[in-house]
């Protein structure tokens, strides 16, 4: 083991802790901003559609991506039903269920970190770096994350649209 590997092993827990603390604050009560909801919907839809376009000829991996997306959509619908929506004099606010959102985001983060470690471990060797779409666990994590957060974003955008229609 060289010094770079040791540094990587020591810094990884700090990175994970920092990501977790950022997610915890992101899952607290937030002001509802319509443009962010639409941006979230587009980003998370692209997060699923871009790998799907790569996997059109590999139906097995496309199936894993679809399974992850379906699970993410299901969890997203359940989570949106448990999201606290508030219309106050100061503005519109929402509070998503923190535990599920943090768990899904940390699962995705763990998968990305694993890919990074794999690339680091294989550098300088003759082992080819696998493509992002070669792992069924990665496709499950991408689908789950994109489906979940895309559904939450779509639900929030629809909520704000209904409020706007009710106001006139």
Predicted regions and their residues:
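Helix-coil boundary and interhelical linker segments in multi-pass alpha-helical membrane proteins
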Residues: 1-5, 51-63, 132
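C-terminal halves and exits of single transmembrane alpha-helices
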Residues: 73-89, 101-118
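C-terminal membrane-adjacent module
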Residues: 103-168
